[in-house]
UniProtKB/Swiss-Prot annotation:
It comes from Mannheimia succiniciproducens (strain KCTC 0769BP / MBEL55E). Pathway: Pyrimidine metabolism; UMP biosynthesis via salvage pathway; UMP from uracil: step 1/1. This is Uracil phosphoribosyltransferase. Its cofactor is Mg(2+). Keywords: Allosteric enzyme, Glycosyltransferase, GTP-binding, Magnesium, Nucleotide-binding, Transferase. Uracil binds at I193, G198, D199, A200. Belongs to the UPRTase family. The gene is upp. Catalyzes the conversion of uracil and 5-phospho-alpha-D-ribose 1-diphosphate (PRPP) to UMP and diphosphate.
Length: 208
C-alpha cells in the first residue's frame, strides 16, 4: 500500500489549529475543508494529462488537461462530508458517492446502512474521505463495498491516522493509496486516536 504523510507546512499548521481543545465548530469545519483540499492536491499529482488546442486570446494555443480520468468522491457518513468540499474545489466535475456505516454494538463490526454510488463507478477513480483512520474498520468495509461494485482505482484521504488503522488497511487492501496529514501515536482503550482530534463528526456538525 502506498502511504503518504503530507508534511507541507500549511498542512501541519492547519492540523495544529484543529487539535486545539477550544476550536470552534466553524473554524474546525473550515479547516477540515482546507486540509482536505491540500490532501487532494497531493493525491492527484499523478493524474495523466494530454495536450489539447484551444482558441486563446491571441489565437490557437496548446494547453494541458486531465486525460480521461473520471473521479467520484466518496465521503463516509457523516464526518466524511466535512472533507468533501475540499476535493470538489479541485475536481468540481467529480460525482459524489455516499456510504453510511454504523458499528454493531455486539460484534463491534462496521455495518453499511446507506449507499448511493455513481452508476459508472467501475470506470472512476474513487477518492474516499473520512477525517479519522482509527481501527480502520469503517474504511475497510467501505473499500470492500466499492470493490464489490467494480471500482478498481481507490485513493483514501484522512486527516489523522493511527498506526493500528494503517496496518489493518494495508493488510486488507494493499493495492490502494492512503494520504494523511498526520500519522499519530496510538489508539487509546476507547478507540480514540491519540493525540488525534477528538470526535471529528461532533466537531464538524456541532453536536455532542
Amino acid at each position: 500500500m502506498k502511504l503518504v504523510e503530507v508534511k507541507h507546512p500549511l498542512v501541519k499548521h492547519k492540523l495544529g489549529l484543529m487539535r486545539a481543545a477550544d476550536v470552534s465548530t466553524k473554524h474546525f469545519r473550515e479547516l477540515a475543508t482546507e486540509v482536505g483540499s491540500l490532501l487532494t492536491y497531493e493525491a492527484t499529482a499523478d493524474l495523466e494529462t494530454e495536450i489539447v488546442t484551444i482558441e486563446g486570446w491571441c489565437g490557437p494555443v496548446e494547453v494541458q488537461r486531465i486525460k480521461g480520468k473520471k473521479v467520484t468522491v466518496v465521503p463516509i457518513l457523516r464526518a466524511g462530508l466535512g472533507m468533501m468540499d475540499g476535493v470538489l474545489e479541485h475536481i468540481p466535475s467529480a460525482r459524489i458517492s455516499v456510504v453510511g456505516m454504523y458499528r454493531d454494538e455486539e460484534t463491534l463490526e462496521p455495518v453499511p446502512y446507506f449507499q448511493k454510488l455513481a452508476s459508472d463507478i467501475e470506470e472512476r477513480l474513487a477518492i474516499v474521505v473520512d477525517p479519522m483512520l482509527a481501527t480502520g474498520g469503517s474504511m475497510i468495509a467501505t473499500i470492500d463495498l466499492l470493490k464489490q461494485k467494480g471500482c478498481k482505482h481507490i485513493k483514501v484521504l484522512v486527516l489523522v491516522a493511527a498506526p493500528e488503522g494503517i496496518k489493518a488497511l494495508e493488510s486488507a487492501h494493499p493495492d490502494i493509496e492512503l494520504y494523511t496529514a498526520s500519522i499519530d501515536d496510538h489508539l487509546n482503550q476507547d478507540g480514540y486516536i491519540i493525540p488525534g482530534l477528538g470526535d471529528a463528526g461532533d466537531k464538524i456538525f456541532g453536536t455532542k
